[in-house]
């Protein structure tokens, strides 16, 4: 006021005017425009953003925690290998075209030539929540409703002379224990010619733990002498990046009142290895994330060997990487988990949904 020779009132009005002028009333518009431009650019790179404010959050991402099945891979399971009675059977490249061909040592075998194989396929069709839908017209293809793993089992059965619908009609389901990430297995109960059959499918460890015998040439033999061969074959299949399911059963004269309690003394039937190929665009996407300073961690319920094989295939993992299983994660306190998260290459395998949540919280 002394230099401008203003009265007190005029000076006060000038001060208020300057204060108002200093407020960036165009800031919101500027930020919104910048975010909108970023959103359009991300859309050009196949990234869909529903909320504008999420663009800013995505810009600060430094770690991606991703599942394997259906994210890194296509989520399209196809049966590749069966293993029954110490015999590996190639059942790959099947999808409702020509009659399915199975091979042992490069030699074709006819469907039904191995009774244990046929029974194992029947178990896969019974312990199953999927459904095959026939073609609706000329030129139309078969469709499968349900989980990709169930779909692979149904297709393998259909291609090798086992009609899933016929099997399910002959042995109607009377009870089910759905797949549980903690149990890592599923069980169903069916009426059967010989009484009642309990069908079980899931990860090898929990299934084999409940088995007391092994199916060989149509009869149950002691498991002890065959356990190591089963475990060795699973190791071989998982190293190839295959998801491996174990199938087992038990026939009882009367229907049990408690299916969970009856899951003991099972007969091991066989293994089925399923291939889920990586998405073709994943390798480049992961490399772009790496160049941007974003680290990728795989968090999956699959076997450690399967996860590492797929991760190596997409260039995300090598022999120097670290793998932590769900059982190992249980022994880690928050401090040790935080230290483990600093590993440049990291896979969490055989983890439950609750453990996945814990991992993401620790990353934050």
Question: For the regions a protein language model found, what residue spans apply to each?
Answer:
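Conserved cytosolic headpiece of P-type ATPases
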Residues: 1-364
């Amino acid at each position: 006021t002394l230099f401008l020779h203003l009265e007190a009132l005029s000076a006060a009005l000038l001060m208020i005017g300057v204060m108002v002028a200093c407020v960036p009333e165009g800031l919101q518009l500027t930020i919104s425009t910048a975010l909108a431009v970023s959103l359009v650019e991300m859309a050009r790179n196949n990234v869909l953003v529903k909320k504008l404010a999420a663009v800013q959050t995505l810009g600060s991402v430094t770690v991606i925690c991703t599942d394997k099945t259906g994210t890194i891979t296509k989520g399209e399971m196809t049966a590749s290998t069966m293993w029954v009675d110490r015999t590996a059977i190639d059942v790959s490249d099947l999808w409702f075209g020509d009659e399915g061909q199975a091979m042992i040592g490069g030699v074709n075998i006819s469907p039904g030539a191995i009774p244990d194989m046929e029974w194992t396929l029947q178990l896969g069709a019974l312990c199953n929540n999927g459904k095959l839908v026939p073609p609706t017209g000329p030129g139309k293809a078969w469709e499968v409703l349900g989980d990709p793993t169930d779909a692979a089992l149904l297709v393998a059965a259909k291609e090798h002379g086992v009609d899933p619908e016929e099997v399910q009609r002959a042995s109607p389901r009377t009870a089910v224990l759905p797949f549980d990430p903690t149990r890592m297995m599923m069980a169903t109960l069916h009426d059967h010619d010989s009484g009642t059959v309990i069908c079980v499918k899931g990860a090898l460890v929990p299934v084999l733990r409940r088995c007391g015998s092994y199916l060989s040439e149509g009869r149950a033999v002691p498991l002890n002498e065959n356990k190591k061969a089963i475990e060795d074959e699973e190791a071989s299949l998982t190293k190839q990046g295959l998801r491996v399911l174990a199938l087992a059963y038990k026939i009882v004269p009367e229907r049990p009142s408690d299916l969970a309690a009856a899951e003991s003394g099972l007969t091991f039937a066989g293994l089925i290895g399923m291939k889920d190929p990586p998405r073709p665009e994943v390798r480049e996407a992961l490399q772009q994330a790496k160049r941007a300073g974003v680290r990728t961690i795989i968090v999956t319920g699959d076997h450690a060997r399967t996860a590492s094989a797929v991760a190596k295939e997409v260039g995300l993992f090598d022999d120097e990487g670290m793998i932590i299983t769900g059982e190992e994660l249980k022994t880690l306190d928050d401090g040790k988990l935080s230290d483990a998260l600093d590993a440049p290459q990291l896979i969490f395998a055989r983890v439950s949904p609750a453990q996945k949540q814990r991992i993401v919280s620790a990353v934050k």
